[in-house]
Amino acid sequence: MSNTTVLLDKKTTEIIKATVPVLKEHGEAITKHFYKILLENNPELKNVFNQTNQRKGAQSKALANTVYAAAANIEKLEEILPHVKQIAHKHVSLNIKPEQYPIVGKYLLIAIKEVLGDAATDEIIEAWEKAYFVIADIFISVEKEMYNEKKNQIGGWTGFRDFKVIKKVKESKEITSFYLKPDDNLPITTFIPGQYITIKAQIESEAYVHLRQYSLSTAPGKDYYRISVKREASNQPIGVVSNYLHTSVEVGSVLPISAPAGDFILDERDHRPLVLISGGVGLTPIMSMLESVVEHQPNRNVVFIHAAKSIDHQAMRKRVSEIAKSKEQVKQYVVYSNPTNRTDGDKQGYIDYEWLKEVIPTKDAAFYLCGPKPFMSAINNDLQNMNIAQNDIHMELFGPLEPIAK
């Protein structure tokens, strides 16, 4: 990566560094305008970008954070490589192509000029054009490597491949699992617990294709994939695809999906105790990790903590209980915020610092968190207050990348 940075001369680098305060102040306004003009002039890209995230402003905020990070680290772009890889996983799952980068660059530069006005001099625009293509080349290089890796794996593929629903199981009041096997009956690639697939939902009533990522919710090594989807409110934009899956997709339905991707992954080389903490549908990648660790690391101590509204909202409750009862090294704790009965669960209300201290046996452990952003932010703060090293805390947020740790 350091080889790419030499393509930027000293003058360009200094100009980019000088714009960092401007990006901090106006970055989100620039990226909001960028998406507006990009999609107005390239409506076919609405088939790629999540329109719900566009309406909520989440995508523009995530892009603003990325642009700011790149500018702030323009002399040492290797510092943002973990962030680049995280985004690249998402890009590969969406089948983003190298030829789309110049289109994005064109409208990003237009947005910078139109939002900043006279402050965006020709010199600044020229510097950002150079910087953008250096950064784009880094993404393209990382993504090319990922595409090649997927293509060359046994059962691997790039782009989208048709899978047939072979089983549909209602797991709770809101969550249903879909078991998927390739329509061509050929092998499928394995995955690392915690990864996701992207579904291409072609809904008759919708003008554009919807692409959605769903975590794989079982251990790898099977001849099928399983996703477990929460049905969102049908009157909300966020619920378009989940309602389609719950109401219109049945056994025999065919769904195009991309190969597994994502960097929220279980490190099976680590033999320290494992603490898995999930909230709501954040259970799905955590369940994959639990299933995998009891299969491949049967002697590893595991603390499984799950927060749900009630017993009716807790997906895969019986399976987790079976594991905890049959595996002495697995300890299960369930917290209900709105329990049906006073005796339900190990705790009523919410996970808090004092309770967490009691159920976590050691600080020297690997922690994996998944759930709503406020949930993860609170748990992360509690763990840091317990002096857990940030490097030992791994988190997955469904949706555009946003900072969680303070």
UniProtKB/Swiss-Prot annotation:
Active site per the UniProt annotation: 101 (charge relay system), 143 (charge relay system)
Gene Ontology BP annotations: cellular response to nitrosative stress; nitric oxide catabolic process; response to toxic substance
Q: Which domain of life is it from?
A: Bacteria
Q: Where does heme b bind?
A: 91
> Record's Pfam families?
FAD_binding_6, Globin, NAD_binding_1
FAD-binding FR-type domain residues: 158-267
Is Acyltransferase found in the keyword set? no
Coiled coil ranges: none
Q: What class of enzyme is it?
A: oxidoreductase
Q: Which GO terms describe its molecular function?
A: FAD binding; heme binding; metal ion binding; nitric oxide dioxygenase NAD(P)H activity; oxygen binding; oxygen carrier activity
Residue ranges of the region described as Reductase: 155-406
Q: How is the cofactor bound?
A: Binds 1 heme b (iron(II)-protoporphyrin IX) group per subunit.
Please report the stretch or stretches of sequence annotated as the Globin domain: 6-144
Give the protein family: Belongs to the globin family. Two-domain flavohemoproteins subfamily.
Domain description: Consists of two distinct domains; an N-terminal heme-containing oxygen-binding domain and a C-terminal reductase domain with binding sites for FAD and NAD(P)H.
Q: What name goes with this protein?
A: Flavohemoprotein
Question: Per the UniProt entry, what species is this protein from, by scientific name?
Answer: Oceanobacillus iheyensis (strain DSM 14371 / CIP 107618 / JCM 11309 / KCTC 3954 / HTE831)
